[in-house]
Amino acid sequence: LAAKNINLSHIDVGGGLGVCYNDEKPPHPEQYAKAIADKLEGRDITLIFEPGRAIMANAGILVTEVEFLKSNEEFNFAIVDAAMNDLIRPSLYSAWQAIIPVEHRDAPTKVYDIVGPICETGDFLGKKRELAIEAGDLLAIRSSGAYGFTMSSNYNSRPRVAEIMVDGADVHVIRKRETIEQLWQGESLLP
C-alpha cells in the first residue's frame, strides 16, 4: 500500500480470536497479539482490536430446567424451559454449546436432543448429547456469554431471562427476568 502512496493511520483487525466451544484450538491472545505486532513492527499505525466474544463467551452460562423427557423410535428428547429465543446461536448458526448437568447423576446415560418448548423445528439448544438426566434436573449450557442476551428475543411472547452475576460466593441480579406485563407495556387496544 505504501508503494501506492496509501498511508494507513490505523488497522482494525476486528475480533479475530476464536472461542473454544467444543474442541476448537483458537490461538492464545498472546500468540495472536505477537503475530500482529510482528507484522506491524516499525510502523506508526494504531491497532484496533475487538475481543468481545473471546472475553465474554465462556463467562456466561444459561441454566435451564428439564421439563419432560420423551422418545420415539429414533430420538430421545429433553424438553427444557429455555428456548431458541433465549439462546439463538445453536439454532441460527448450528453453534455447538457444551451442555452439562448442574448436578451429576450416577445413572446410565442416553443420547438426547435438547429442545425448547417453542413450536418450531429449529428450537434446539444441542443435539446428540450423552447425558444422565431426569425431569426437574438443571442443565448448564456453557459458553453462552457472547451475544446470548443481545441476540435474545421475545419470540412467542416469551419474557427474556434474568442475568445473574456470580462473583466468588456472591450472587447479584444484574437484570431481572422480564414479565408478561412488560411485554405489553407499549401496546394499545384499538378504540
Q: Model regions: which residues?
A:
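Charged (often Lys/Glu-rich) extended helix/loop segments that serve as interaction or gating elements
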Residues: 35, 44-191
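Conserved N-terminal phosphate-binding loop of PLP-dependent enzymes in the Aspartate aminotransferase
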Residues: 28
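Short, hydrophobic/aliphatic alpha-helical segments
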Residues: 2-5, 134-136
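Flexible, glycine/charged-enriched surface loops at secondary-structure junctions
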Residues: 3-10, 46-51
